[in-house]
């Protein structure tokens, strides 16, 4: 397990994201933006009880640390039994230190894959993820960097190939989100962060990975329900997620002649650091309450979808799919 600090200044990226966050918070202090309404009890469909709203008031500094969340996200999927679906494979996961990326890393390891995770700055979260991967009997590589930097992406891929002998699965999962009540509120800096991370980052990492991917390899992109239905306060973010869905389908058509499948998972609300680092303290208490399940998903409820799409034994004829995991037909 190693931490590789690259020349690109990730500290600057984090401070830029926090500046955008502070601007939003200041606007809402003056406008008095209210919180959402409550919910009834959630239906039970999971093998174990899952947390329901309301959750405690909380707000995280970007990019958000999983260790600070209350309740802690569930990512270990103890009811999931591995069966060597990814045995002998190497996977690279962006945004792999926490949230969905962490849960995917754990299940990939349980299925026999070695895992490299790329993350921005949360070293403690990344170490915990790697420790969980290693407990599954797999190897884990930690790589610090900003996916907006194409040189970082090339380096991350090369480090993965050097460490594990190849690259079989790429999961583009890193993202940036900051809400705005109108398009006029979105500054150039805000827009650059969103487009740079959510579109350029996906293209940068995929472009770097492709020369190392052979027939049978798989690329999985993290989309969003906002890319399917839009969101009134996530204008730029929704646009990037729609673009990711289109990129997924286009790459699937482009790469099938090389035997490389490309699919996406489109999650609904998921309890990760991502949203508490965006929403206000009061608003987050009811996060996920308006979904059909009346609660947010836990990361461990998303990760099996990524295993399914990555595994040739499960999804060899699935290509260009946008798999919605919404808790209902419209989230």
Residue spans for each PLM region:
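Alpha-helical segment proximal to the catalytic Tyr-Lys
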Residues: 211, 253-257
């Amino acid at each position: 397990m190693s931490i590789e600090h690259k020349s690109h200044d990730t500290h600057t990226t984090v401070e830029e994201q926090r500046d955008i966050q502070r601007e939003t918070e200041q606007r809402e202090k003056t406008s008095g933006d209210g919180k959402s309404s409550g919910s009834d009890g959630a239906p039970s469909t999971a093998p174990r009880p899952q947390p329901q709203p309301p959750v405690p008031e909380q707000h995280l500094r970007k990019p958000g640390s999983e260790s600070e969340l209350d309740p802690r996200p569930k990512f270990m999927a103890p009811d999931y039994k591995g069966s060597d679906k990814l045995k002998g494979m190497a996977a690279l996961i962006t945004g792999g230190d926490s949230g969905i990326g962490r849960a995917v890393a754990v299940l990939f390891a349980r299925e026999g894959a070695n895992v490299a995770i790329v993350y921005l700055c949360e070293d403690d979260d990344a170490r915990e993820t790697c420790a969980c991967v290693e407990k599954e009997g797999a190897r884990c590589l930690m790589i610090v960097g900003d996916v907006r930097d194409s040189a970082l992406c090339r380096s991350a891929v090369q480090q993965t190939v050097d460490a594990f002998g190849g690259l079989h699965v790429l999961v583009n999962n890193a993202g940036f989100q900051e809400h705005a009540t109108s398009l006029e509120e979105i500054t150039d800096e805000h827009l650059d962060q969103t487009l740079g991370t959510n579109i350029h980052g996906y293209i940068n990492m995929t472009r770097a990975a492709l020369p190392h991917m052979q027939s049978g390899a798989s690329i999985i992109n993290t989309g969003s329900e906002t890319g399917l239905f839009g969101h009134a306060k996530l204008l730029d973010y929704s646009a990037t997620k729609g673009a990711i869905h289109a990129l997924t389908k286009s790459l699937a058509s482009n790469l099938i002649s090389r035997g490389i499948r490309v699919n996406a998972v489109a999650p609904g609300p998921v309890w990760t650091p991502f949203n508490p680092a965006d929403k206000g303290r009061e608003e987050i208490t009811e996060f996920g309450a308006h979904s059909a399940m009346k609660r947010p998903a836990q990361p461990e409820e998303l990760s099996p979808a990524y295993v399914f799409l990555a595994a040739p034994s499960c999804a060899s004829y699935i290509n260009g799919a946008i798999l919605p995991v919404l808790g209902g037909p419209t989230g």
